Amino acid sequence: MPLYEHVFLARQDASTQQVEELTTQMTGIVEGLGGKVTKTENWGVRSLTYRMNKNRKAHFVLLNIDAPSAAIAEIERQERISEDVIRYLSVRVDELEEGPSAMMRKADRDRERDDRGGGFRGERDGGGFRGDRGDRGDRGPRRPRDEETADEE
């Protein structure tokens, strides 16, 4: 059977439970038509690049599907009918990605960065006079200041 990656965006004001119900409904459709969902990832609420149907944010969900094309057609038909789904995209792939997707790896990496305790670095030295920094090698010698212009001011 063909392999698909299917991503859908649900409205921001839909609860997490409603998004999980949508995901369960899509999984049920696939399994009812002889396929299987090998991986489900909920990427959470993320900002959209541009407004879609008056929404600035959406719940992102990824499904890795091993199913006939009729199952994908039925999923897309149901998502067109559903008011909670803003957009969807199904892509046929040669092989499904094992382990977490790129979005989940990014989320894990961001979480690790937060755990490092960065942020406030305490009091810093410096910020005042740094002394003579020497000549700039990329410029010629400085021209002398005019004594006359300094006296006039």
UniProtKB/Swiss-Prot annotation:
Family annotation (Gene3D superfamilies): 3.30.70.60
UniProt-annotated stretches for the region Disordered: 97-153
Single GO term (MF): small ribosomal subunit rRNA binding
Cellular-component GO terms for this entry: cytosolic small ribosomal subunit
Pfam families listed in its UniProt record: Ribosomal_S6 (PF01250)
Family statement drawn from the similarity comment of this UniProt entry: Belongs to the bacterial ribosomal protein bS6 family.
The protein's role, per its UniProt record: Binds together with bS18 to 16S ribosomal RNA.
UniProt-listed PANTHER family: MITOCHONDRIAL 28S RIBOSOMAL PROTEIN S6 (PTHR21011), SMALL RIBOSOMAL SUBUNIT PROTEIN BS6M (PTHR21011:SF1)
Protein name: Small ribosomal subunit protein bS6
Taxonomic path: Bacteria, Pseudomonadati, Pseudomonadota, Alphaproteobacteria, Hyphomicrobiales
Gene that encodes the chain: rpsF
